[in-house]
Each structure stands twice: as structure tokens, then as C-alpha cells.
Amino acid sequence: MSICTREISLEILNLIYNGITFDEALVKVENWAKLDARDKSFVKMIILTLIRRNIEIDLILSNYVKYIPRDFVTNILRIGITQILFLRIPEYSAVNISANLVKKRKKNLTNFVNAVLRQICRDKEKLISNLHIQKNIPQWIFSNWKKSFGIDLAQKFANQCLKEPYLDINIKKNEFSLKNWSNALNGKNLFGEIVRKKNTGSIEDLSNYSDGKWWIQSASASVPVNIICNYFEKINYCKTNILEVGAAPGGKTTQLCDNKFNVTALDIS
């Protein structure tokens, strides 16, 4: 993997810390589209791991620097720490590439970045042993979970927030019985027409991507439409009008249309 992947990771992270969403940042960073699937997966892994653990990473960083400015140098350090502590990246690679990134932009801070990351490498075992997943959850949220569900469930919720989510795929009703979709998509049928699989590789490479036979929709998002279908099961769906407000990204809208409802979907432009 070339330094280009870290360059692009830095560009994306700079945008995110300036209020741009992850998806918007991917569009704005010109070189993102030029990466192959493997490098795109690597960049996403860096950024999403960093975002999920950003509170913890900044707490660690605060032990090594007196002040954490909102600039690209801090983001380079964040990317370096993410690779050293949470990803299977050789330490020397994470440190050297981070130093080269800052050298291109602010040469006088190269030794600083190099020194901080090398010290983190030396302290790696101690830092990992002191990691607490719940630190990545805002305290008020974790306290509410603990009060409502108890400490064990609250901890499980925190653990789940750090995991890569599965990819859920909803198959069109008239297509579902015509093919073994669990095998075709390398997943498993959860319920109804929902197939769940590990979120790896490019969606465009999945079976029948261009044929309009399925769409991406989380299993939980499909439940409200299932309830509506059960409620109106004795009525001609074509004569039932559904108004969906806040319709993006469109999974429930597509599901309603697939069930022959007359749908009006609204969202901000």
C-alpha cells in the first residue's frame, strides 16, 4: 500500500473535523475515486476505526502533547495512533509515513511527530492494557444506558459501537424465491427477504448489483414496513396511500413500493 492511502486518509479526516460528513468527504477528495478497491477498503478502515475511537485516541494523545490543536498535524498523529494501537500495521511503517506526511507540509514539526509516535510505540503494551471501550461513548449516553439497562448491557452496547456493522440486503419479493440469495450474496437469510453479510469488498461487485433485484436496507429499518404490510394485509395495497417524511436514503420507500403501496416520499433537497 502506498503513501497515497494515508494522504487521502488525511484529506478525508481534515474535512470531517471541519464539519463535513464522511460520505461528503469521499466526494470532495478527488483522488479517492482513483484508488482501487483494496486501497479504498484500507482508507475506510483507518478513518472508521479512528472515528469510532476518537475520544480514546485524543485522551491518549493528551498524555503526550500539552495542547491538541484542530489542524492537520493533530490528524496525522491520530492516524498514526490508530495504526499503531488498533490496526495490524507495522509500527515503523505507521511512524515513518506519518513523519513524511508532516514533512511535506510543515517540515519543522517532523521530529515532533516522529518523537510522539515512537514514544507511543514504546508504551504500546501499557496503552492497550489500559484501553476502556466505554470511553468512546459520551459520558451522558453511557450513564443513561447504565441507569436504564444495567452495567453489563451498557458495556455490551459500547462494545457493539466499535464493531464493523453487517451489510443487510433486501431482495425484491418476486425475486426472492427464484434464487438462493444467501449463497449468491455469501450471507444468511435473517427473516423475510433480508440477507445479512459481512460488509467487505465493493457493493458494485455483488451478484445482480445492476439488475435492480435488491437494495441495501438495514434489517431494523425493514420492520416498520413489515408491520404496515401486516396491518393492511386484507386491503389492496395499491389503494393505500403512504406518506413517508424523512425518506432518505430510501430503503423503506423502496420496500413500500415493492409491496405495491402508493407512496409519497419527502426529504430535504
What role is predicted for each listed range?
Residues 1-205, 238-241, 259:
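Class I Rossmann-like S-adenosyl-L-methionine
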Residues 179-269:
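Rossmann-like S-adenosyl-L-methionine
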